[in-house]
């Protein structure tokens, strides 16, 4: 076990001694030892040279591939252009429509019929087309176009006409009547006619007032009320009437069963009062006073009552 580690230690010393003694040997040995590596490198160089063309070919393939990819792209625009040209060739064919030129007589007949009837049935269109020497489709399209034109014209001119119609058709406004009167008569402050007709004649206060007028007319022609009101009115409380009031009251105090002598004595005591009463009775018995009472009762207002 002790000999084995000693051997490697002695060997480097021997090698070192050999190297010291022969100095040029390492110079020779160096290339000899490096030669196989050079050979290996030279052997590897052909291999690398043989391998290097492969990447170059791949590079060429990669470089060629974009060219191949771009080449169809260059062809695609041509196909698109061809398709566009084909579409352009087809579009004018679709737009080419034969426009029928109507004569003046045909237009007059069509317009006249359109004014009378905007929608025609199948038989009517066929009859009209036979009369005008036109096809059914031509008559149908003309009526459709004419209806569209009329609708467009109405739509454009409708606001102007509608404003004029509303201004003409609006009911005239009337001022409010009897503004200072009772609220029952203030039926329509704004003065619109339909509101006036609905509320005036259906109002309870108006009917009550008419009933009061009827009661007033009956009351004025009633004999009892007319006598009491005419005698109790302030207009008849004149000094001429008051002069015989005491004598009249003294006469009214006696009963109807009293003897005539007592009545004559009382009348003589009254003196001139009796003459005044007789004169007033004669005055009120004349037809002129009756007419005066009637005129007064009819001309009296409710406030006097």
Swiss-Prot record:
Residues 196-240 are annotated as: 8 X repeats starting with a Trp in each unit. Keywords: Activator, Developmental protein, DNA-binding, Homeobox, Nucleus, Repeat, Repressor, Transcription, Transcription regulation. Residues 196-240 are annotated as: Sufficient for transactivation activity. Its main location: nucleus. Interacts with SMAD1. Interacts with SALL4. Interacts with ZNF281/ZFP281. Interacts with PCGF1. Interacts with ESRRB; reciprocally modulates their transcriptional activities. Interacts with NSD2. InterPro entries: Distal-less_Homeobox_TF, HD, Homeobox_CS, Homeodomain-like_sf. Residues 241-305 are annotated as: Sufficient for strong transactivation activity. GO terms for biological process: cell differentiation; regulation of transcription by RNA polymerase II; stem cell population maintenance. Residues 1-96 are annotated as: Disordered. This is Homeobox protein NANOG. The keyword Disulfide bond does not apply. It comes from Pan troglodytes (Chimpanzee). Residues 65-83 have a biased composition (Polar residues).
